[in-house]
């Protein structure tokens, strides 16, 4: 049985193009998993195995890879850097124990770096930092570490220092051991020598060595006291303190190098072994009760406890349906029967595999700490708990963001409907942030996602991977509706048509709810005017209407309803009568309560060369942007701004034109806000026209 203390489940996180996939490739090369490193530059990387990833030079799916370094098992997940695929990062963090944050030596802390860092902090994931691409023009290790402090609010613990700059970057100095690692010009990772610190760096190395020791020993009161008395701690004692501080997120061991040029990578692997936690050293996952609340128990990581695992990713590849799981406790053998706690159904495990990106190794068994894929499971979705049927439990589920953009698609020929339906079913299972519905009036299939690139990739997969020839509509914004004032109202549903009739009268207050509260209901009825048995029917009636607003038919957000009185008939009143009354009350009262149209606001991060700042800001103002921040960088200016999603379609083309191709941007959903009257009127009119045309 494998020693859990020698397991490292880690993710690699970064902004687009910071070099995380190349970093993963070099890790695989050094650990002997591949013999020739691939590159995103030429579309040959091992973890970017989708056609869309190879062509665009970005990571879209989280690819799991297993490898070994110094008797330690690494399960590595290379995650996407583009904000449209943040859900992949989120669900990876859910099952990881540690991570490597990769930052570009010239780009520094970029927008998606902040998002990933925030998610990792929320998940309590310990990390080491790798400042990559120090061979690039404009790379500056210390500028990046300063940004880590200023922008991320994190404390970088500098473990290596660069030898040389830009094209003269030849190696690194290990600050703890005060040894220099110098690579030759062959570009091979193993072609390095360990030397004395260069003469012109001795003072600098000594300064950072002292700072490293001082910061580390603060994690151990006894060691700190002896250090203050002049006793120099051993390297092993310092490493133990660094490990504790890293696990507690007190600081982040920070390394430098060039993944592409194979410089500095061995020290990163050593850092994963020395400082990132094993599965038994992280806070255990909470267990949930039937209502979805924490029950006070935890999924302790141990091979001696009953089997518990979380399905964190579903993927359909050329080998068949794969369910990626993180095993938290117990053991799993081929042929075992396991319970899906969500569905209540059991399944037999036919085949288990260990993933090597696009390849696989068959497994006879797996244990706590492992990240594996089970082949051919049915009715399992992302976030489902798999467990021992004799010991049913539920792990904390995953919560995914709501899509903000949609497009209509339909096959060019009728024969493509079935093919498209099967393909979309598989894609929805793989990506919980990708949703699909059918327009009841037009019969069109509506694809919903997190951004233009997200849906662009999905359409591309439908066309090329599944061979569905599509007609694709224009992107549509996911508007919402809400109310702005509190009213008190009454509604009676009465129907008599021979025999027993229907009767339900409700008196209620309806008012704006808390932001992001959705729908809330309470009853303050005193006495028996509305019997308690009918209260759930009233709630159900109101809630069922939240999906279709009165202004333009968009879903309604944040409404609170209080039932305070009413009336009933001993014979004619029923649950269905009160449900119908609540539906009528909703239609009657929402217009009176100041119905308002809401639009999604995006948090936009724009980078532009300095000489184009005026044009870019002017354009953002015309797009109804609200400026949040503006900060100068080494090669340009970074602008943070909130902009309505409706104003951002096609923005990349405009930005490239304004900046001669040098501008970049990313955006993610921020919040919903009221539409200006002129915008609301146009949207409502367009929706009415669309419905009339159907």
Swiss-Prot record:
SUPFAM superfamilies: EF-G C-terminal domain-like (SSF54980), P-loop containing nucleoside triphosphate hydrolases (SSF52540), Ribosomal protein S5 domain 2-like (SSF54211), Translation proteins (SSF50447). Catalyzes the GTP-dependent ribosomal translocation step during translation elongation. During this step, the ribosome changes from the pre-translocational (PRE) to the post-translocational (POST) state as the newly formed A-site-bound peptidyl-tRNA and P-site-bound deacylated tRNA move to the P and E sites, respectively. Catalyzes the coordinated movement of the two tRNA molecules, the mRNA and conformational changes in the ribosome. It is found in: Cytoplasm. Its main location: cytoplasm. GO terms for cellular component: cytoplasm. This is Elongation factor G 2. GTP binds at residues 14-21, 78-82, 132-135. NCBIfam families: EF-G, PRK12740.1-5, small_GTP. The keyword Nucleotide-binding applies. The keyword Ligase does not apply. InterPro entries: EFG_II, EFG_III, EFG_III/V, EFG_IV, EFG_V, EFG_V-like, EFTu-like_2, P-loop_NTPase. Keywords: Cytoplasm, Elongation factor, GTP-binding, Nucleotide-binding, Protein biosynthesis.
């Amino acid at each position: 049985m494998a020693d859990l203390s020698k397991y490292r489940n880690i993710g690699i996180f970064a902004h687009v193009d910071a070099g995380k996939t190349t970093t993963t490739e070099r890790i695989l090369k050094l650990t002997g998993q591949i013999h020739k490193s691939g590159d995103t530059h030429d579309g040959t990387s091992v973890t970017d195995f989708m056609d869309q990833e190879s062509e665009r030079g970005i990571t879209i799916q989280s690819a799991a890879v297993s490898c070994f370094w110094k008797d330690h098992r690494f399960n590595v997940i290379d995650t996407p850097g583009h904000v449209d695929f943040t859900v992949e990062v989120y669900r990876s963090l859910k099952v990881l124990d540690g991570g490597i944050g990769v930052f570009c030596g010239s780009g520094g802390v970029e927008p998606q770096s902040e998002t990933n860092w925030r998610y990792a902090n929320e998940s309590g994931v310990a990390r080491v930092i790798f400042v990559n691409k120090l061979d690039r023009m404009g790379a500056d290790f210390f500028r990046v570490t300063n940004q880590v402090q200023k922008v991320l609010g994190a404390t970088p613990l500098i473990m290596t220092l660069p030898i040389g700059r830009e094209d003269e970057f030849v190696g690194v100095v290990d600050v703890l051991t005060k040894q220099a690692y110098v690579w030759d010009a062959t570009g091979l990772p193993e072609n390095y020598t360990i030397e004395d610190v260069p003469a012109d760096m001795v003072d600098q190395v000594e300064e950072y060595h002292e700072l490293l020791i001082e910061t580390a020993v603060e994690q151990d009161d006894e060691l700190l006291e002896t250090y203050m008395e002049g006793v120099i701690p051993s390297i092993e004692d310092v490493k133990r303190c660094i490990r504790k501080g890293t696990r507690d997120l007190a600081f982040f061991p920070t390394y430098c190098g060039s993944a592409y040029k194979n410089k500095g990578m061995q020290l990163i692997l050593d850092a994963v072994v020395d400082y990132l936690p094993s599965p038994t050293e992280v806070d255990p996952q909470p267990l949930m009760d039937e209502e979805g609340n924490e029950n006070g128990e935890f999924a302790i990581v141990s091979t001696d406890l009953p089997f518990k695992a979380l399905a964190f990713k579903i993927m359909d590849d050329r080998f068949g349906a794969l369910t990626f799981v993180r095993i938290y406790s117990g053991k799993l053998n081929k042929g075992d029967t396991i319970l899906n706690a969500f569905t209540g159904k059991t399944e037999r495990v036919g085949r288990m595999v260990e993933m090597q990106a696009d390849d696989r190794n068959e497994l006879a068994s797996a244990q706590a700490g492992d990240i594996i894929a089970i082949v051919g499971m049915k009715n399992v979705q992302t976030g489902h708990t798999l467990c021992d049927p004799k010991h049913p439990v539920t792990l904390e589920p995953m919560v995914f963001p709501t899509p903000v953009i949609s497009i209509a698609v339909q096959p060019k020929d009728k024969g493509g409907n079935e093919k498209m339906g099967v393909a979309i079913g598989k894609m929805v299972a793989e990506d919980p942030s990708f949703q699909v519905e059918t327009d009841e009036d037009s019969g069109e299939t509506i694809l919903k996602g997190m951004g233009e690139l997200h849906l662009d990739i999905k359409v591309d997969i439908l066309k090329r991977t599944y061979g569905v020839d599509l007609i694709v509509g224009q992107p549509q914004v996911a508007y919402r509706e809400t109310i702005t004032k509190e009213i008190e109202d009454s509604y009676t549903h009465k129907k008599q048509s021979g025999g027993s009739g229907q009767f339900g009268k409700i008196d209620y207050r309806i008012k704006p709810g808390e932001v992001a509260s959705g729908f809330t209901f309470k009853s303050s009825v005193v006495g028996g005017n509305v019997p308690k048995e009918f209260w759930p029917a009233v709630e159900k009636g109101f809630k069922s209407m939240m999906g279709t607003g009165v202004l333009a038919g968009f879903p309604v957000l944040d409404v609170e309803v209080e039932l305070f009185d009413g009336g009933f008939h001993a014979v004619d009143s029923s649950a269905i009568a009160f449900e119908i009354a609540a539906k009528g009350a909703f239609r009657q009262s929402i217009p009176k309560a100041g119905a308002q149209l809401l639009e999604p606001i995006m948090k936009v991060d724009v980078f532009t060369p300095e000489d184009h700042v005026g044009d870019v800001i002017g354009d953002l103002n015309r797009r109804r942007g609200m400026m949040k921040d503006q900060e100068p960088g080494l090669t340009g200016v970074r602008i943070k701004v909130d902009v309505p999603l409706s104003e951002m379609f096609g923005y990349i083309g405009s930005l490239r034109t304004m900046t001669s191709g040098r501008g970049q941007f990313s955006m993610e959903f921020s919040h919903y806000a009221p539409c200006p009257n002129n915008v609301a009127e146009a949207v409502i009119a367009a929706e009415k026209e669309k419905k009339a045309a159907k």
